[in-house]
From Swiss-Prot:
[4Fe-4S] cluster 2 binds at residues 203, 219, 246, 249. This is Epoxyqueuosine reductase. One of its GO terms (biological process) is queuosine biosynthetic process. The keyword Zinc-finger does not apply. InterPro entries: 4Fe4S_Fe-S-bd, 4Fe4S_Fe_S_CS, QueG, QueG_DUF1730. [4Fe-4S] cluster 1 binds at residues 193, 196, 199, 253. Catalyzes the conversion of epoxyqueuosine (oQ) to queuosine (Q), which is a hypermodified base found in the wobble positions of tRNA(Asp), tRNA(Asn), tRNA(His) and tRNA(Tyr). The keyword rRNA-binding does not apply. Residues 181-213 form the 4Fe-4S ferredoxin-type domain. Pathway: tRNA modification; tRNA-queuosine biosynthesis.
Amino acid sequence: MSEPLDLNQLAHKIKQWGLELGFQQVGITDTDLSESEPKLQAWLDKQYHGEMDWMARHGMLRARPHELLPGTLRVISVRMNYLPANAAFASTLKNPKLGYVSRYALGRDYHKLLRNRLKKLGEMIQQHCVSLNFRPFVDSAPILERPLAEKAGLGWTGKHSLILNREAGSFFFLGELLVDIPLPVDQPVEEGCGKCVACMTICPTGAIVEPYTVDARRCISYLTIELEGAIPEELRPLMGNRIYGCDDCQLICPWNRYSQLTTEDDFSPRKPLHAPELIELFAWSEEKFLKVTEGSAIRRIGHLRWLRNIAVALGNAPWDETILAALESRKGEHPLLDEHIAWAIAQQIERRNACIVEVQLPKKQRLVRVIEKGLPRDA
């Protein structure tokens, strides 16, 4: 063990070590989330968590870090940028024949990377303590990471419920290290949303039902990632070409003009997932899906839900015979997929018929003009 440091020195060192490990910011807070408990309970009571039963099952444990690791006195909260240099947001979203994957999922799964870095941070702290118990968390345990990040001074909660930072926007991952030493804590920052409601207005499905409250049952991220069954039919047309997650509420946010690019190679987009053709994705076998998504967050939804999401996007695409053929080719593989294929085919046929009407109408209008030209002026 190295020479023990006093707690103020240690807190300073922890932030320095965190930066050296690749985190963009490190903050420290206590474990008191009592103010968040009523909000969490109200959210659960309204069933806004949808089918994410684990949220209700863990209940208030999420707001009590000291119960996750008995003896915990402080939470070290960290953030790491994930925005790649070639994100290509607009070009992908504007092309309905391409599949849009939320930019956090284009590269390697962040859970393992952040957890390993947090573990290293814990081991570095351990070298300067007589004794230390620690436990890293990365979006994988019942813990309210955003309120903790807010208390630790990493940013404020935006109306889309994500953490916003004045120098970095919101395109970053969060992680926590629970420790049992009474480090000095950081102070929250002032919120900066003001009267802006851009995120609420832009949400394709109206999932941000009131400021700071998201009804997950309407959120495209929930529908494409967490929901195991059929996507509600009334929401399918609103999903566009978003096949895994959604970034709209972040893209519209004025604070994301200050977003910083990631320095992690692991977060660079994988070519098969970056602006891919929907028809090509829909042709993937399960073997191909597992190969391409190895080490990716996408893999956890499985091949079936992947195809379900793409079927919806194909249904939202402009009429194309090749799309219709692609949809027909996967009929009969699974009832869940069949339901979404049938819907998508109906959408495609409806657009084809609309195209026929649009073509016929100008021809009729031209014929009327020709006849009118041949008539006497006083006819």
